């Protein structure tokens, strides 16, 4: 495998995500969230871990039955089968990295972006096909 160097500007924009790296063993995306966005629905992944590294601002997570506030420099990881929800920005614009190990989640983001562009909402079958199990 070749070395991978990627700027944010050269990443693939998929909804609110910019995919920075997409490999079999790792997928990294960057998000910018404004305060007031709705949290994601609680879910878990059976086949991969989902990690979030806060670059700037504060995020609030629902993970493993708790609410956790993460400031810049904090890493939050939901290992396989741990229930969590996509975070919300607290107080100000927030930037963070989302890491999936192993990789492959970029396909989910692409299809989700296409669905939203058509005004569609993903159903449970779509979610489960992409290792996302609502609870």
Placement of each model-derived feature along the sequence:
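Short acidic-glycine-tyrosine-enriched beta hairpin
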Residues: 65-83
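Short, conserved beta-strand element in jelly-roll/cupin
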Residues: 30-34, 44-62, 99
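Acidic/histidine-enriched, glycine/proline-rich intrinsically disordered or flexible terminal extensions
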Residues: 107-135
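A short glycine-rich, His/Asp/Glu-containing loop-to-beta-strand
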Residues: 8-42, 48
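Short beta-strand segments
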Residues: 40-42, 63-68
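Ligand-binding loop in jelly-roll beta-barrel domains
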Residues: 60, 80-106
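Tight coil/turn sites that cap or link beta-strands
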Residues: 35-37, 73, 81, 91
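Well-ordered beta-strand scaffold positions
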Residues: 26, 58, 66-68
């Amino acid at each position: 495998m070749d070395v991978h160097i990627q700027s944010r500007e050269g990443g693939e924009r998929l909804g609110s995500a910019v995919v920075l790296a997409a490999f079999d063993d790792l997928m990294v995306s960057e998000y910018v969230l404004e305060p007031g966005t709705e949290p994601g629905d609680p879910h878990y992944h059976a086949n991969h871990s989902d990690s979030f590294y806060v670059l700037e601002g504060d995020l609030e997570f629902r993970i493993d039955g708790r609410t956790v506030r993460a400031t810049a420099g904090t890493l939050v990881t939901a290992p396989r089968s741990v229930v969590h929800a996509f975070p919300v920005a607290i107080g100000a614009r927030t930037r963070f990295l989302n890491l999936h190990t192993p990789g492959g989640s970029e396909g989910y983001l692409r299809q989700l972006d296409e669905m939203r562009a058509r005004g569609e909402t993903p159903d449970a079958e779509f979610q489960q096909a992409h290792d996302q199990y609502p609870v």
